[in-house]
Amino acid sequence: MRNLKSVTPLLMAALLWGQSLLAQASLPDFTALVEEASPAVVNISTRQKMPERSVAAQPGLPDLEGLPPMFREFFERSIPQMPRNPGGRQREAQSLGSGFIISADGYVLTNNHVVADADEIIVRLSDRSELEAKLIGADPRSDVALLKVEGKGLPTVRLGKSDELKVGEWVLAIGSPFGFDHSVTAGIVSAKGRNLPSDSYVPFIQTDVAINPGNSGGPLFNLKGEVVGINSQIFTRSGGFMGLSFAIPMEVALQVSEQLKADGKVTRGWLGVVIQEVNKDLAESFGLDRPAGALVAQVLEDGPADKGGLQVGDVILSLNGKPIVMSADLPHLVGGLKPGEKAEMDVVRDGSRKKLKVTIGTLPEEGQELAAAGSTKGGERSSNRLGVTVVELTAEQKKGLDLRGGVVVKEVLSGPAAMIGLRPGDVITHLNNQAIDSTATFAKVAQELPKNRSVSMRVLRQGRASFITFKLAE
């Protein structure tokens, strides 16, 4: 027993030491990666000349021009309405960001929002030398910008394939958060293919790498030391890092940069549809086994989809053999196609599968807005089953809204219509997968709606169409 007691502490110490070594062995060592990659990561500063706000002096407030600089800054921060610069002079706005060199002759990738509207762009290298950069082109839709500095034999990063990234894989960022050059942070890939509301054409890489203002435009590396993304956005309620960072995949950035280098702009494929997500109730309503695909809520007249035979209510399941798992997958795939290219789609229509061929168009510079419905005249019908009163669309409204049919909600009573959020002025174009061309059709379809089953309704509100679902109780 004495021998056992004396051995036990030694065994425990050995076990703890072994666990410590195992933990250390499982954590990556980033030192070699950082030493190799850092020289090609740059700090980007911009200057923009802006007219000073010229505000007339207000009673009880001093003129800032007559104050010492220290007091002037205090009043500017504390009292936004403080009059400043009555002479109308220009002031200089500055911003900081990051970037990385992709070619030895000086091409640099960064974010569009880092250099947007800049009058001067300065790139500072790791040796603290500064070079003036020329903006070759920028693409607001992907938030990618391509710069050029004069130089030869510049250090460059190695480019990797972001589509080979796996969730849970270690990644590392180098950038200039809050101006602190070449700060290194690490984390893991949290998710892939994230769609953000303001960016329909980028399937973002989500990470938990600490990203802060100033990191924008900097590289995201894998453990091989290859750039797999451009750090672009964070989700935050405080203005700082909260564990949700988003990077532009390198494949997207390279496609954009190649077009910017060749043409100074980006041309994307376009289908001419408005789509929405397919949830469980919509899947049941449209005869799908499970939620999948992109539901066509709107088809632009004479657009590529319209000419190819796509209809409102179709569910697009694949494009050129690539599955559409989420509706956000479709814009990414279509945007990557060249205008004039033929594309094959698998769609579900009225519960049956169909194949359609569409000639891809060119994405317009700006979206086309549809006018909202106004007051109406014509026949009036009420549906007690839905709790709604509808009236006919006028010819002028049909033309203005680019519609062939539909009815306008005049009054919403208690019932399913109120529960799903219908409002007066909404235009109902489809009910239970049937086109509504008149108030009589609406009343007939509403009367025949099934009970205890998801029913879809297509609604146009302020120019935007979407499908909503509801169930009628027994």
Curated annotation (Swiss-Prot):
GO biological process, one term: proteolysis
Positions annotated to bind substrate: G214, N215, S216, L271, G272, V273, V274, I275
Broadest EC class assigned to this enzyme: hydrolase
GO cellular component, one term: periplasmic space
Keyword set, alphabetical order: Hydrolase, Periplasm, Protease, Repeat, Serine protease, Signal, Stress response
Source organism, top-level taxon: Bacteria
Pfam family name, one: Trypsin_2
Entry EC number(s): 3.4.21.107
UniProt-listed InterPro entries: PDZ (IPR001478), PDZ_sf (IPR036034), Pept_S1C_Do (IPR011782), Peptidase_S1_PA (IPR009003), Peptidase_S1C (IPR001940)
Signal peptide start and end residues: 1-25
Active site (catalytic residues): H113 (charge relay system), D143 (charge relay system), S216 (charge relay system)
Domain PDZ positions: 260-351, 357-463
SMART domains the UniProt entry points to: PDZ
Principal cellular location given in the protein's record: periplasm
SS bonds (residue pairs): none
Molecular function GO labels: serine-type endopeptidase activity
Database matches in NCBIfam families: degP_htrA_DO
Function of the molecule: Might be efficient in the degradation of transiently denatured and unfolded proteins which accumulate in the periplasm following stress conditions.
Homology family: Belongs to the peptidase S1C family.
Name of this protein: Probable periplasmic serine endoprotease DegP-like
Organism: Ectopseudomonas mendocina (strain ymp)
Taxonomic lineage of the native organism: Bacteria, Pseudomonadati, Pseudomonadota, Gammaproteobacteria, Pseudomonadales
